[in-house]
Amino acid sequence: YIISLFSGTLLIQIANQNELVSPYYVANLLWYPAYEILFSIIRKIKNKKSAFEPDNSHFHQLLYLYLKGFFKNKKINNTLTGCILNLYHLVFVFIVSIDYSNTKYQVMMISLSIIIYSFFYVILKKIIRTKI
């Protein structure tokens, strides 16, 4: 968590001190953890659960459960889950870095990424629900 705090603070300082960097570029780099937490809180409130209690409905957990259907080794599933998420985010970072000063482009990319996340979340949730 401390590395994330320092990274986020550094990115915000870079955007504040450099007029060429859109603040939405920083938002693009930080959207996933923020959205995951917000989405989790909303999901728990909707299901009448405490927002502070853990649950097993996070995107990475659903992806892990999905991969369990293909590989029986927990280490492979865990590694693949991390690799898939990191690869997606790495590709996304390269895409949003193409035009880091264009605010409209950055807002469009945040929106697209949230749509992609939500789409795959719903798909994984349905697949996992039918397997259980």
Where would I find each of the regions flagged by the language model?
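Alpha-helical transmembrane segments
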Residues: 1-132
